[in-house]
């Protein structure tokens, strides 16, 4: 009878649900970690075919000139050019243009001003011509245009006439006069004055819009299909020297940007800004992002429950069954985990543990222990739960492989990096590395420092 009376209190305790007051959690987020500046290098291709056609159309197709004098040789000329076919070299344009000219001349050996203050020829003038009433005389012209990009993201050009070759000389036999040098002097002068026109037209080619499109696209959030939104937050830009693809008639330049990217599950308004003044180009490659990922505690709750829900811990004829886990928040950068359990006892208790990310990308809760309230209640209701084997089992199981999630995220980002951004604007890229390097706890979630690297192309 005494033995039965002795067991009654234990029996009554075993029927009760263990109820423990919730711990106090942090209500203020800690200062955010200062991350290294992220680098993004985006090769940009700008199609010049239609724009160079516009340049060609805008340049004069012909010009005329004359030089009249009473005594000696007077002449008038007309020059007509064929269409310009731009040849793109590595860092410049070179183009040879076929042209043709006609020349009308007259010659007076001696003038006097007796009857005319402008002078009059003492004998009848001798007239001659080249390319008039016959095929016009041929000439080959060549220009070279060096191209760079200004701090304002515009073409800056310097065009020079490099070739002027008269293929059909103009020799006037009637008065033994070789007009070739005179033609060269006059027409060449006109062609040299054309250098500035060529510069103006090429500099009017709009490359700023293409570069601004890159900047604007990086200001837009990238939807990671269920994993949140990636905000690049570009801060500065510099451009590589421009080069040209001769086959496809396009300009190629690499935009080198610095950024402060982050990932969040909550959409934030995009912040737009004008193109910044160009920074110094450092010749980087690909992209290397240090991203602050804002992840809610629910995301880890799902992973923990998937691995630990239903987990059984037997001990000396008793058993604890983990029904579910829930992260409440943190205390001094230690997670507070609410554990609902059943088995020999039923109820809840709270654990505290320090999270860390291992080099092989596992989320690990280390130094798991009961919080103070749990210790106090369990000492009175279920002292046997203090056995170190229970915490050892929980510590051993509190390790979660992030690699499947990271690989899935990597594939999602890769898909987003290979998509159409706008009409005629396509983004392509790869993700070579995605890894979490550190973790910090906030009031409602984690701040994960994530390193992402790969290549981009527009």
Question: Which positions does each model-derived feature cover?
Answer:
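Extracellular/lumenal and peripheral-membrane lipid-interaction modules
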Residues: 16-458
